[in-house]
A protein has these predicted regions:
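Active-site-adjacent structural elements that line small-molecule/cofactor binding pockets in enzymes
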Residues: 1-166
Length: 166
């Protein structure tokens, strides 16, 4: 917080919020709060984690791609200031609306590893965070992102691609 208060250009991002561990409405509230702290500089990183990590929390790990698609759809509407009622397979918010929506769109980044999630990220995300892959797989991962982007009528240039380095 102190760093953000003293700067104007540094962005802040959630590393990766596990979408299995909190509903999209709560994540939207947290993202809106980040945007209040650093107006126009918040970014939201989301991911599905792994079966093993979800098991630690006692949370099932099912339908990661369709769950992510639904989550992001709800999140975008809530962050746009809409009153959201959604009848999804996984989430069903009823009349939820932020008391104060962010004035600018908060970019959503998806952590992705497997081809289907990489394609989904290319289709619906503002950015993609690659992790846990050897350098030789980066080119193929980017090709999968490009496939998803093309399906949505987007260009790879529309998507910010980052990579965790370990």
């Amino acid at each position: 917080g102190a760093l953000l208060a003293r700067t104007q250009r540094i962005h802040i991002s959630t590393g990766i919020v596990s979408l299995y561990l909190r509903p999209p409405t709560l994540t939207a509230m947290q993202a809106a709060t980040l945007d209040l702290i650093a107006p126009g500089r918040a970014r939201l990183g989301l991911g599905v984690s792994t079966q093993n990590i979800n098991a630690f929390h006692g949370v099932p790990w099912d339908h990661p791609v369709s769950r992510t698609r639904e989550y992001v759809a709800i999140l975008r509407r809530v962050l746009a200031g809409e009153r959201v009622t959604y009848d999804g397979k996984f989430y069903r918010p009823r009349g939820f609306q932020l008391s104060m929506a962010p004035p600018k769109r908060i970019p959503i980044y998806l952590a992705a590893v497997n081809p289907k999630m990489l394609q989904l990220a290319g289709e619906i995300a503002d950015g993609v965070l690659l992790a846990w892959l050897p350098a030789r797989q980066v080119r193929q991962s980017i090709a999968e992102i490009a496939k998803g982007a093309a399906r949505a009528g987007r260009s790879l240039a529309d998507i910010d691609i980052g990579c965790y380095i370990h």
